[in-house]
Amino acid sequence: MVSKLDKYWQHPALYWPLLILFAAATPFTFAPYYHFWLMPLIFGAFVRLIELRPRFAVSSAYLFGLTAYTTQFYWIHTALHDVSGLPDLYAVPLTFLLPAYLALYPALCFWLWKKFTLPRGIKIGLVLPILWTLTEFARERFLTGFGWGAIGYSQITPDSPLAGFAPLGGIHMVTLATAFLGVWLVLASNNTARSGKRLLPIILIAALLAAGYTARQTDFTRPDGSRSTVALLQGNIDQTLKWREDQVIPTIQKYYEQVGKTTADIVILPETAIPVMRQNLPENILAKFAEQAQNNGSALAVGISQYTSDGNGYENAVINLTGYQENNQDGIPYYAKNHLVPFGEYKPLPFLTTPLYKMMDMPLSDFRKGGGKQSALLMKNQKIAFNICYEDGFGDELIAAAKDATLLANASNMAWYGKSNAMYQHLQQSQARAMELGRYMVRATNTGATAIISPKGNIIAQAQPDTETVLEGHIKGYVGETPYMKTGSSWWLMGILALAALILFIFRNKEH
């Protein structure tokens, strides 16, 4: 099949359009579409195209990445233009800026790949998936990191056996498995190969799927016997109105009424639900929230910004109002966001970006980090490891807190991105974290996707996006550690890097 297509695919009139087409199809492999089976086919077709014209490997990989990331993250334009009011003259080129940077990583992967002089089966079937995974890992770490769009996320769905690798080695192991499946499909479908060479990748594919399925059925963590009801508040506050002074009282009143309508054990408000600095609020406001929750038998967590303890900055926090007493503001337990969004929550290049911030009239764009390991917040009978906004896109950073927690919780405000796919892509990342860490993940968001996710990554309840609502459901506390929690990503990634180096060393010695 592949050999018959090759003569058409390598023609310049088809090669570049096909490359763009395959890349543009990648968003359909992620949430909200969940066509997980499509990603290995796309990746395999992409690799086969590059095989046909290896001279253009680096430029082809860059174009593929640029197209894929632009179509996946089109919602950047929504945030810049539709919400922040930046004119298209600036919003359009800035929308391409992040994909243009991210595309450097696929290009780097194939630049390194071209350096290997190896038999095709090893170069395609082993080395390439390793290099792809390592460069994806680098993309998540370098310059604060941005791991959205890693091909492994396409498999985070109940139907994909490859999702079973998440609790074993995290999302990057799922990425490695997805890349392996894609290239082994190419090797298995090669009509010119001898039957023996075609049989090996078929066996490897079967073994890979079986291993993933088996891991998916394995319970690495266990319930601790505790059960709780949770209420996740979704205020549906328009981002263009959120920080206006005339909307502060209506917003506070809305959430106060929502808190009063639920008798759940644990009640969680979204990120920056209260659009005022905590220390600037009249103390009786928080006291009333705490009293309202206490009267209903609830523990209450609220997303709010607050000044740092030294008073020299501010931080994005979730405060635990359980047992709150008026006149004791300094004694409030809280979690403060540690992994900040560059250009959104702090200014990495203030001399360049300050004029843009003024044009967009962005509030609170210079947050401070909350610090390294922070204690889980005790709410009723659950120890909750909170993360805020896109922090749940970084699995390794959540491990330490998760070890001491029975429940994971994310507080977010995705109103910046309107009705785009951003909220669903973010939800899929939370599904991955639940699987990696073997615990329930609850998500309280302003506009969506508010949800309850099981330790297997299944969405067991979800609120209708872009509506004012309260999502209620049941969760269990979980304890124990997945294999991923014991080692993180770094150790096994160093192992496959060493394997790639060993392969190169062996074959170079054979040449000499």
Curated annotation (Swiss-Prot):
Domain CN hydrolase intervals: 233-477
Family annotation (InterPro entries): Apolipo_AcylTrfase, C-N_Hydrolase, C-N_Hydrolase_sf, LNT_N
Encoding gene per record: lnt
Keywords: Acyltransferase, Cell inner membrane, Cell membrane, Membrane, Transferase, Transmembrane, Transmembrane helix
Top EC class for this record: transferase
Organism: Neisseria meningitidis serogroup B (strain ATCC BAA-335 / MC58)
Name the record gives this protein: Apolipoprotein N-acyltransferase
Its EC number(s): 2.3.1.269
Subcellular location: Cell inner membrane
Annotated GO MF terms: N-acyltransferase activity
Transmembrane segments: 5-25, 56-76, 92-112, 118-138, 168-188, 195-215, 487-507
Keyword Nucleotide-binding: no
Principal subcellular localization: membrane
Alphabetical GO biological process terms: lipoprotein biosynthetic process
A single Gene Ontology CC term: plasma membrane
Catalytic residues (UniProt): 271 (proton acceptor), 337, 389 (nucleophile)
Pathway(s) served: Protein modification; lipoprotein biosynthesis (N-acyl transfer)
Span of the signal peptide: none
Bilayer disposition of the protein: Multi-pass membrane protein
Sequence similarity: Belongs to the CN hydrolase family. Apolipoprotein N-acyltransferase subfamily.
Transferase is among the record's keywords: yes
The protein's role, per its UniProt record: Catalyzes the phospholipid dependent N-acylation of the N-terminal cysteine of apolipoprotein, the last step in lipoprotein maturation.
HAMAP family membership: Lnt
